[in-house]
Design a protein with these regions (language model features):
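Short coil-to-beta-strand
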Residues: 6-17, 55, 98, 159-161
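Short acidic/His/Gly/Ser-rich catalytic and metal-binding motifs that mark active-site loops
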Residues: 20-24, 68-69, 167-172
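Short connector loops/turns at beta-strand edges and beta->alpha or beta->beta junctions
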Residues: 16-20, 64-65, 103, 164-167
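Soluble metallo-hydrolase cores and metallopeptidase-like ectodomains found primarily
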Residues: 1-26, 49
């Protein structure tokens, strides 16, 4: 019957779960791949207690974020490029998205890249301010190519919550002892507040 279908999700929460492949050392990727994926799984658990919010959210786990050689138009972001192509015909269904990447650093400093959608940036900062963690969310002047890039390119405004000031990035030192449960709590709480008070209101 016309009008009988339930409305689909309108907001994306994303992470990549792959890790960089190195021939010369064992790369664990505790922060770069692991932290954001763990956070997204916890967001799923939390949203399960809030069905009115949960039905509006789609969780997306990307593979192939890392480049085999060097990031380019043809290397890296394989999963998000594919996903963006799949949803492009129905892109207006989605009001926006959050990408989590490298969010577990003990010395947390989420640096929003220059391509962050302006209104989303303001609302994320307002959410962080409300939770008294605004000092851990700042701007970055560094252009970052990440899984949010293909989504922004098709017109789904997506913000990259990333701590790129992380010295063990792409080294053997990216291990779980560098991570903090408190940092994950901060990012998850800000995202949840943003969903409830801004994105899905």
């Amino acid at each position: 019957m016309p009008g009988s279908e339930k409305p689909g999700p309108t907001f994306l929460l994303c992470s990549h779960y792959d890790t960089k492949i190195f021939d010369t050392f064992r790369f664990v990727g505790a922060n770069d791949g692991g932290s954001s994926t763990g956070l997204l799984l916890e967001m799923a658990r939390v949203l399960g207690h809030h069905p009115d919010l949960a039905k509006k959210v789609e969780l997306v786990f990307f593979d192939g974020e890392e480049a085999f050689e060097t990031f380019s138009d043809t290397d890296g972001l394989y999963g998000s490029r594919y996903f963006a192509r799949q949803i492009e015909p129905n892109r207006k269904q989605f009001r926006g998205g959050i990408l989590f990447d490298m969010v577990g650093d003990r010395s947390l400093d989420i640096t929003l890249p220059p391509d962050s959608p302006a209104q989303m940036t303001q609302d994320i900062f307002a959410s962080a301010e409300a939770l008294k963690v605004r000092s851990q969310f700042t701007y970055s002047s560094l252009e970052i190519t990440d899984d949010h890039t293909p989504l922004n390119a098709i017109g789904v405004p997506t913000i990259d919550l990333i701590d790129f000031d992380y010295s063990p990035w792409h080294t053997a030192g990216d291990t779980i002892d560098k991570l903090s449960a408190e940092s994950l709590q901060v990012v998850g709480s800000v995202a949840a507040y943003y969903l409830a008070e801004f994105a899905l209101k």
